Amino acid sequence: MFLSHPPQVIQPTYHTVNFLPRSPLKPPSCSVALNNPSISSGAGAKISNNQLIQSLCKEGKLKQAIRVLSQESSPSQQTYELLILCCGHRSSLSDALRVHRHILDNGSDQDPFLATKLIGMYSDLGSVDYARKVFDKTRKRTIYVWNALFRALTLAGHGEEVLGLYWKMNRIGVESDRFTYTYVLKACVASECTVNHLMKGKEIHAHLTRRGYSSHVYIMTTLVDMYARFGCVDYASYVFGGMPVRNVVSWSAMIACYAKNGKAFEALRTFREMMRETKDSSPNSVTMVSVLQACASLAALEQGKLIHGYILRRGLDSILPVISALVTMYGRCGKLEVGQRVFDRMHDRDVVSWNSLISSYGVHGYGKKAIQIFEEMLANGASPTPVTFVSVLGACSHEGLVEEGKRLFETMWRDHGIKPQIEHYACMVDLLGRANRLDEAAKMVQDMRTEPGPKVWGSLLGSCRIHGNVELAERASRRLFALEPKNAGNYVLLADIYAEAQMWDEVKRVKKLLEHRGLQKLPGRCWMEVRRKMYSFVSVDEFNPLMEQIHAFLVKLAEDMKEKGYIPQTKGVLYELETEEKERIVLGHSEKLALAFGLINTSKGEPIRITKNLRLCEDCHLFTKFISKFMEKEILVRDVNRFHRFKNGVCSCGDYW
């Protein structure tokens, strides 16, 4: 789709606008220049001054170069270029302004080449307003001048302005080049990622395809990254699949796209393809971070260990983002002690490293330990970020540390100047709600200074599910249905609450509403790794004939556990059925299928690790406790909220999840 009404083109009028101070350069005397016997009047002096300035710039002696500049009336373009580059890398804004003033006084400000360099200089110094002014005063705007401004504005986060200027540039007939498309594609995600920005990105995709840039590896890689940031995995995959040439950056972009958008299997598959197909280049640190993220998502411990070994062999174990990703990977694979050892061996730590460790302890339910690490982080001089508080407040929630969580929430703004965001309020509502302090949770939502979003109302509805508060659940669900009419999970959660309260007419009403809106319940799915291979299991009401062995094993196992005291918990079944039929349904839950497969295919004493995409239900939680006791198995289950470590009939969550 193309713009039906392109922006109106206003032909610029040019006026002399002085945005720099008009004071002549009167620097202190330069002993280097004045004492140089080669400097004398005439052409020889000009050559010597230019050469001296260039030499000083190359040596990083900007102050001295500027002093010599005051003695030179006609610096060459190369001299100005080196001065501008030196200013961008080493100077204060005042030095840059002095060089710019000399260019203006010398009448060289309309040189498009120097204008391009000046815009880049001001961008590097973080002075985007000066960059705009240089652009506005430049009459002959080549594509390089436009690109320089696009780069400056994109880096400064002014994506909307870049896109507006891009359409204007097209209207006046300036041809884009490969750098133009790179900058404007990045501009699409420089601000908030909205549907409007996505549509503009698709239009730019069409433009560059028509103009023959669809085979350029760098542009296509940027396009993959743009679609990834919008969550358009299929578009990104299509672009990547059509690339005739791929480099390590393009492979890394596609792997990151899958890893960040919940496609961990595809991320690992793409990494394997990369290792087979790339001969001239090896995966870099960016690749490793994304692959480790995929391993963490699936709790693929054995594959994560292989990646760790590769990182060590490649010497990437000194790069902070890689080490932080390793800490997270081991934590989310249930090997908290290994993640701690990796962290302890770090020579340098940044806030991301600390956040990784805090989050790892939090997801295992060790709230007190997470708080201890948080305080250790502060003692080491690291400043917390909003992500830090999400991690530590989440840790408090999983262990029920209400007062500690409230204290930390209060310190965010008071001690650290961090304004609580929606995510922090959602953590607090979850903390209070899990502790059955639903009135406090509801009051916090009511007193919020910003509009509560789906995360906050979702936390409240989840708490109502735990404690069976129908009235508050109805209030929260009404807001969620308005905010997220297409999120089937909210309808299912309300139906669960009604089912546990035996309110079957209301269950039917919610199910009809779900069907009327064309929504489907997200099926429960589990993953597990056995001998370095990943297996996936989906909840079904009717058993798959291909899983007859697992089915038969489960039926026998359930009968054995019943003899030992196991009573199936069927309150959450959304059907008004006979007890036997309900038991058959809960026996088909994905975590039970994965558990049975693990019992069949692992040796005695070998732990079973399962990852689930939803909250662990009460029946599966109880069933797994019985299995861990009577089958003498250690079983680790990571659901959407936290880790459950089952051993000898006891769960590490203390039945608080």
Swiss-Prot record:
Positions of region (Type DYW motif): 563-657
Swiss-Prot/TrEMBL PPR repeat ranges: 45-75, 76-110, 111-141, 142-176, 177-215, 216-246, 247-277, 284-318, 319-349, 350-384, 385-420, 421-451
Location of this chain's protein in the cell: Plastid, Chloroplast
Ranges for region Type E(+) motif: 532-562
InterPro entries: DYW_dom (IPR032867), E_motif (IPR046848), Pentatricopeptide_rpt (IPR002885), PPR_At4g14850-like_plant (IPR046960), TPR-like_helical_dom_sf (IPR011990)
Positions of disulphide bridges: none
One record GO biological process: polycistronic mRNA processing
Record family assignment: Belongs to the PPR family. PCMP-H subfamily.
Protein name per its UniProtKB record: Pentatricopeptide repeat-containing protein CRR2, chloroplastic
UniProt organism field: Arabidopsis thaliana (Mouse-ear cress)
Gene: CRR2
